[in-house]
Amino acid sequence: VNSGVGSVMVGHIALPQIDSTTIRPLPKDLRSKPLDTDEGGEIIEEESTIPATLSPAMGAILRNDLKFPGLIVTDALSMSGLTIYFTQEEAAVRALEAGADQLLKPANVDAAFNGVLQAVKSGRLSEQRIAESARKILAAKYDLGLVQQRLTLVDSIDRVVAGKDAINLAREIAEHAITLVRDEDKLVPLDLKPDAHIVNLAITNGDDRLWIANAFVSRLSRGGRKIDTIVLDERSSEKEVQKAVEMAKTADLVIASLYGRVRSGQARSVGLPDAGARALSALIENKSRLLGISFGNPYLLQTFPGLRTYMVAYGDMVSLQHAAARAVLGEIDIVGKLPISLPGLYPRGT
């Protein structure tokens, strides 16, 4: 807010310390189908407290306490965190009552619209309240030049998003983000002979085994260093797990590149697949010279506390994978700090 951001997106996070209003699941026949959960995906159904998106405390804090003048945008109204507890009509009205200006991605647009319309007709919402948000949205469009240029020039997107300035900024941010949480074995930066045997064990919870580690390995091997890579995912067999463990036994160094990314509505949505977890646990038990790098979920050290060297890159973008490789090679200083605490292990700021 102090930096002048134009909008804030509020998530469906319950903070009972701020608003302890109790909510209960709707009967299943009244729910909209959530768009964030695959068929058969796990959905938590239990009594909870009101999510920030629909809490009047949200608007009070942003508008009154922080004096935020910009747009307040909801998280997607189609997410199961709302659809389990509220109809689309009620969710839309409550979000506006809480102070939101834009209602993002309803599961049923007509239902959300009609809910707001009926709330205005009944006097639950005033026309003034709707006009207030409409003015803010129109003002934001004007400030962004969308009044003069309503359509995005698709052909120019790559020149901006993938332009030199954007790439340089991404590289700078990535190199400042890399965090060496723990290095008990003093593995970073690498101090190995050029012909040292390095094994990269890439473990991914995505459907991307053919390419996920390419950016990291290509940057790490620049200069001729040979790296053997094996990738484990949800489809990997026990034979592949054993192959990875055997390869590690002859290695001078094993790098476990861990791609445990957030995947909404998926089983083990932030963790590692069973095959990868078994292989990693075996390497830890065998006391391999092991460097773990999380290209996603920073909390993996809590699941694998035996990792004596642990680096966090926070994501799998090319800029972050290249930055992690450069950090491992000692080409850049490692200056990142944990933005979160690892309970029982390391506090925020480590």
Regions found by a protein language model. Give the residues of each.
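Preference for extracellular/luminal or secreted protein segments
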Residues: 50, 55, 84-350
